Amino acid sequence: VLSPADKTNVKAAWDKVGGHAGEYGAEALERMFLSFPTTKTYFPHFDLSHGSAQVKGHGKKVADALTLAVGHVDDMPHALSALSDLHAHKLRVDPVNFKLLSHCLLVTLAAHLPAEFTPAVHASLDKFLASVSTVLTSKYR
């Protein structure tokens, strides 16, 4: 459960991401594909090379979903319900992959926002991404 301080930290950090959200989402996906090659199996139709339009496009989708989650931090299950259905029933993404992408997002944010990425913000973002992952995997049960 996110504390009030966590919510404040997450919103402040995401505000700093600003217009770079899609770019950071794509970078996190690239990191995931390089670090955890098995994740590529969900994207057989994508050009997974550095800077590909498809990875950038999906990175923007990831960032948009996170922006939605930040904006509805007190009601993520409702806000992300359609996305949860999509990943559970149509795409059938293994839930572990959300943890892998979350890790890569944290690394990407730390690389781009070193001054803002304090231990407290790191912990809050980690809890937030874990909450998003829990919501996205809730329909698997």
Curated annotation (Swiss-Prot):
GO MF terms held by the record: haptoglobin binding; heme binding; iron ion binding; organic acid binding; oxygen binding; oxygen carrier activity; peroxidase activity
Coiled coil: none
Keyword Isomerase: no
Single Gene Ontology BP annotation: hydrogen peroxide catabolic process
Xref: Gene3D superfamilies: Globins (1.10.490.10)
PTM-bearing positions, type N6-succinyllysine: K7, K11, K16, K40
Phosphothreonine modification, residue list: T8, T108, T134, T137
Modified residues (Phosphotyrosine): Y24
Entry-annotated residues carrying Phosphoserine: S3, S35, S49, S102, S124, S131, S138
Binding locations of O2: H58
Record domain Globin: where: 1-141
Tissue: Red blood cells.
Residue positions where N6-acetyllysine is found in the record: K16
Keywords assigned: Acetylation, Heme, Iron, Metal-binding, Oxygen transport, Phosphoprotein, Transport
One GO CC annotation: blood microparticle
Binding locations of heme b: H87
The UniProt record lists the keyword Heme: yes
Protein role: Involved in oxygen transport from the lung to the various peripheral tissues.
Quaternary structure, from the entry: Heterotetramer of two alpha chains and two beta chains.
Family stated for the protein in its record: Belongs to the globin family.
Protein name: Hemoglobin subunit alpha-1/2
